[in-house]
A protein has these predicted regions:
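Patatin-like phospholipase
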Residues: 2-4, 8-73, 85-295
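Gly/Ala-rich beta-loop-alpha elbow adjacent to hydrolase catalytic centers
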Residues: 75, 79
Length: 295
């Protein structure tokens, strides 16, 4: 019996070795998606120049027609008026229609006697009426308005508050408009410190600045009446400041406005066309700068 048992044990099949299944192939991690190219923040810096400011409208029209939308806008003096209207949501066509129907006598609320010939409240009301009651911080495009603190001579950038008051302050040419009191301070034309507010567009976050200089170049002709003489004096002062301010612009536009003075409100369409031509001439350069700063 023992022999049979032993023989049975010897003839039992050996168990097969256990072989582990190979692990599934490891999939390589997916490549991270390519980052979406980020275009630079474009700032539009609109300079002062009184009635020559209609040229800013032509610049805006050409930008719109080419699908280029500024991310923010800063304005001085006449540039602050166009900047406020544009920031409120007005298109280039709407701005041109406003320019065509504008009655400059609405701005001339005379003040006798006073520290200026014009109070400026008419200008402030015009801005309020055409910006839909929006405050500066509520604008559809971020807006900055530059004025000069009369007490210390420093620049102030308005980014909050009543756009009418800010534009009035920014446009208050000394001796023409009364200084504008806001709180305990008095403010006058921003062109005294920043004729074209390039550095303020940078301060607001612009990575690429389009600067529009509409200042008049003295042509050697008689200035005529006192208003033209004052505006030309103001322009001469601003040109030396602009030499430094405009160095930081990525694209500089100087609309050609021969024989158009800052007091000439009859050349609106010609000024708009000059702005269009200035922007069209720099479109290729602007696209190159945008491409170079896209990352």
């Amino acid at each position: 019996m023992a022999a049979l048992t032993l023989a049975g044990c010897q003839s039992a099949p050996k168990p097969l070795p256990v072989v582990a299944a190979p692990p599934p192939p490891v999939e390589p991690p997916p490549l991270p998606p390519k980052p979406i190219p980020k275009a630079p923040r474009i700032g539009l810096a609109l300079g002062g120049g009184a009635a020559r400011g209609f040229a800013h409208i032509g610049v805006i029209q050409v930008l719109e027609e080419n699908g280029i939308k500024p991310d923010l806008v800063a304005g001085t003096s006449a540039g602050s008026l166009v900047a406020a209207l544009y920031a409120s949501g007005k298109s280039g066509a709407e701005l041109a229609a406003l320019a065509d129907s504008m009655d400059e006598s609405a701005f001339t609320d005379w003040s006798f006697p006073g520290r200026g010939l014009i109070r400026g409240e008419g200008l402030a009301k015009y801005v309020r009426d055409h910006t839909g009651g929006l405050r500066i911080e509520q604008m559809r495009v971020p807006l900055g308005i530059v004025a000069t603190d009369l007490d210390n001579g420093e620049a102030i950038l308005f980014q909050r508050g009543d756009p009418g008051v800010a534009v009035r302050a920014s446009s208050a040419v000394p001796a023409v408009f009364q200084p504008v009191r806001i709180g305990l301070r008095e403010y006058v034309d921003g062109g005294l410190v920043a004729p074209v507010p390039v550095r303020f567009a940078r301060q607001m976050g612009a990575e690429l600045v389009i600067a529009v200089d509409i200042s008049a170049v003295p042509d050697g002709n008689p200035t005529g009446d006192a208003m033209r003489m004052l505006l030309q004096t103001f322009s001469i002062m601003g040109r030396s400041i602009n030499t430094f301010e405009l160095r930081d612009a990525d694209v500089l536009l100087r609309p050609k406005l021969p024989n158009v003075s800052g007091a000439d409100f009859t050349a609106r369409k010609r000024s708009i066309q000059a702005g269009r031509e200035a922007m069209q001439s720099q479109l290729a350069a602007l696209r190159e700068r945008i491409a170079a700063k896209t990352h």
